[in-house]
Every structure is written in C-alpha cells, then in structure tokens.
C-alpha cells in the first residue's frame, strides 16, 4: 500500500485509547511506582504503553494537579538509559516529539542526516506543517532555516524541497504524457550523460505527486532497462543517495520502508536505539500493525521476535508492549 493512500485507522494502530479511562488513578499508580526507594518499572510500562498519547497528556495534567510535580521530569529523574529515552518519548505530543528528533539531529557537532531524511520523506504535507509549527514554538527558530544552516549542497536542496510536502498533492488523474516526459528527463539527467544533473532528479522526485511518480518509475524502467533505485545508486552517493532512495521507497510502500528501518536498526552488531524508539513510538498510533505485517513478509520473522533477541530488561518489555501481538 502506497503511503498517500488512507487505510482503516484501526487496522494500523497498536496503541489504542483505553476504554473507561480515568487519568486520576493512572497518575496515582505512577506516583506510587516512583515514590520512595526503588521504582516499579512494570507499573510504569503497564500504564504508559497502554494509553493513547492524548490520554498520556491527561495523565500528566492529573499528576501535576494531584502531586504538584511534572510527570516527564519525574520520570527522567527515576529512570535511566534506553528505557528512560523510550518512556520520555511516549510523553511528547506527536508533532513535538518529531520536532525534538529533528532538533536533536542538528544540535551540537555533526548532523544525523538519516533522521532528517527519514522524517521529511515519510510525512504528509499536513504532518510536516504541524512539525514545523511545533519546532518554531519549542526552539524559537524556523526548521527550514535550521536545515539550511546545518546542511549544504544538493542534500540541503532536497531536504528543503521535501519540507514543502508537494508529493502529498494527490489526484487520481495522472497525465501519462507528463509521466513519460519526466522519465525521459530523468534518463537524460543521469544514465544518458557523463555526470549527473542532480537538480533534475530533485525537482521531479520532490515536486510530483506520489501517484504520478509511480507511473514515472514504471516508464523509467522501460527506457533505462534498470530501476530508478539502481540508477540513483550508480549516479549519486552518500546522504543525497540516501535521501533520493528514501523518497522512492516511501512513494512505493511506506509500510515496507518503516519495516526496513526497524530491521536494520537491530540487524548486526549493536542496536540503533534512536531509530528503533522513534519509529515504534511515532507509528504506534498510525500504522505499526501494517508495518509488522510487511516486516514478517520481508524478513521471515516477526518484529517482536527480533526485539526479544536484540534488547533486554524493562526496555524490551516496554517495546514489546507497544508493538503488541504478532500478525
């Protein structure tokens, strides 16, 4: 299923609103879990991973009203490591969380281009608008200007172009003539010449609708006798290559893209915990069930079985609780 098509929300959601919800006893449970010596981590998992984000915000308000403390700050002081990072991520409203991830990717020395590419290439125009608004409110600067200050060259251009969210302007009508012309232009900008006209690739990949791009990719393969992905790999490199390939993958199948991100976050030595946490938290109320199905089809194992192999302790238990039962 391509990324711009809607799916039945309940099909995709692993974390749903708790029925018969009352924030006051939940806030009290959390207070008791962190009161005195030691912390009852399982009680924290049971409450926060089984409530929707909206309900968590209500619990935080009740916690403040009853006990005069900020819930997120209290959690930070009681927890540590990857488990703390995951639980704190759950407490952010969705767009503020993604704004924070983008801000963290750019602050300090070095830039985590992969995080920026992942978020900008996979969100809809409305989601990007909300993220930009949250970013400006929380950090007092423009996301677009910060990206321009922190990146350069063609990578900067593709990221700024993605921020406009033009691929989300979808109509069911695709002009076959324009799709063929775009495919010919891509071929002329890469395989046909020595060197590459990167701006032609960026313009077509970032400003055409997703439905249109699918037709372009089909026409391109007929002209070039190779896939658009293979051409991008041979014509570009580094972060620009990663950005272009991400646009193609998200256009073709968003759920497969996230399944791949989760798989490679855990495959091999070490775990990319930031990628694992961000994608499970941010997709849990959107389409994580659908991502789980694609994960199993693509890799022959379930997402939860890989989490069990690759993580441990309270961190593992919280992730498994968010992911829910196997497809």
From Swiss-Prot:
InterPro entries hit by this protein: Annexin, Annexin_repeat, Annexin_repeat_CS, Annexin_sf, ANX8
Domain of life: Eukaryota
UniProt family annotation: Belongs to the annexin family.
Pfam families: Annexin
Per-repeat ranges for Annexin: 21-92, 93-164, 177-249, 253-324
Keywords: Annexin, Blood coagulation, Calcium, Calcium/phospholipid-binding, Hemostasis, Metal-binding, Repeat
Protein's name in the database: Annexin A8
MF GO annotations: actin filament binding; calcium ion binding; calcium-dependent phospholipid binding; phosphatidylinositol-3,4,5-trisphosphate binding; phosphatidylinositol-3,4-bisphosphate binding; phosphatidylinositol-4,5-bisphosphate binding; phosphatidylserine binding; phospholipase A2 inhibitor activity
Keyword Iron belongs to the record: no
GO cellular component, one term: collagen-containing extracellular matrix
Residues holding Ca(2+): 266, 268, 270, 310
Free-text domain note: A pair of annexin repeats may form one binding site for calcium and phospholipid.
GO BP annotation list: blood coagulation; endosomal transport; endosome organization
Role according to the record: This protein is an anticoagulant protein that acts as an indirect inhibitor of the thromboplastin-specific complex, which is involved in the blood coagulation cascade.
Statement: the UniProt record of this protein carries the keyword Metal-binding: yes
